[in-house]
């Protein structure tokens, strides 16, 4: 362990770090491992919109949350606190941190908010504490927090396999997205237990996605049957494009070639929906924030 990782760090002012949302442009389940985890294939698309994680380094080693970005979630259960403590434990870092999150990404919507926040803490504190861990090491730590964390650590759009941790960077065309949060949350484990879920899809290749033949999400038919609010959103979005589900839901989206087209579609939606527009990113703004501190 590099000695700098074992030293305390001086107190700093607050710094702001982006935690972008993501979309799953398709998602299929191809099998199940011996330990019960499902094997999947998906494409992660990073967005130019998301949460902001504020960090302040504190000497003495204490890690604490400031504010309550997730009402009802105990501090010890908060992914950002768990991420900071995991990094501290893994490296022997003696510095601490205060963490505050400006939440914009809906919790439990499949947009990756919790995972992205955790990844941002890992990447940012690695820089602020002067630890010097490589992306591979940070991604390995992130996997202990959740299968989606590594893609946010690496910061690139990716084809994903395994439980979502086997990542192959891919280039995606520019696009804008109309996003809708139906406002319902179904725990992912309950969806994986559903008898309606297709678990034996034929493994696909990146070329299949590139050809446009992969658009479906295995959780979509399950959620649309179970949740009237999700079905209502799909019906509303079908009037302006082809709606899709992200993650295990319940967030929905429609892809457009330009932001102007997405905003025009947004204006056509009925009132009462929580809807907004975001653009796809070629890479995570978190990487830009990290690199700016290294200059």
Swiss-Prot record:
Presence of the UniProt keyword Transferase in the record: yes
Gene Ontology molecular-function annotations: 4-(cytidine 5'-diphospho)-2-C-methyl-D-erythritol kinase activity; ATP binding
Pathway where it operates: Isoprenoid biosynthesis; isopentenyl diphosphate biosynthesis via DXP pathway; isopentenyl diphosphate from 1-deoxy-D-xylulose 5-phosphate: step 3/6
UniProtKB keywords? ATP-binding, Isoprene biosynthesis, Kinase, Nucleotide-binding, Transferase
Q: Which residues bind ATP?
A: 106-116
Q: Which residues form the active site?
A: 22, 148
The lineage's top-level taxon is Bacteria
Recorded catalytic reaction(s): these are:
4-CDP-2-C-methyl-D-erythritol + ATP = 4-CDP-2-C-methyl-D-erythritol 2-phosphate + ADP + H(+)
A GO biological-process term: terpenoid biosynthetic process
InterPro entries hit by this protein: GHMP_kinase_C_dom, GHMP_kinase_C_sf, GHMP_kinase_N_dom, IspE, Ribosomal_Su5_D2-typ_SF, Ribsml_uS5_D2-typ_fold_subgr
Q: What is this enzyme's EC?
A: 2.7.1.148
Q: Give the matching Pfam families.
A: GHMP_kinases_C (PF08544), GHMP_kinases_N (PF00288)
| Physiological role | Catalyzes the phosphorylation of the position 2 hydroxy group of 4-diphosphocytidyl-2C-methyl-D-erythritol.
| Family from the record | Belongs to the GHMP kinase family. IspE subfamily.
Q: What is this protein's name?
A: 4-diphosphocytidyl-2-C-methyl-D-erythritol kinase
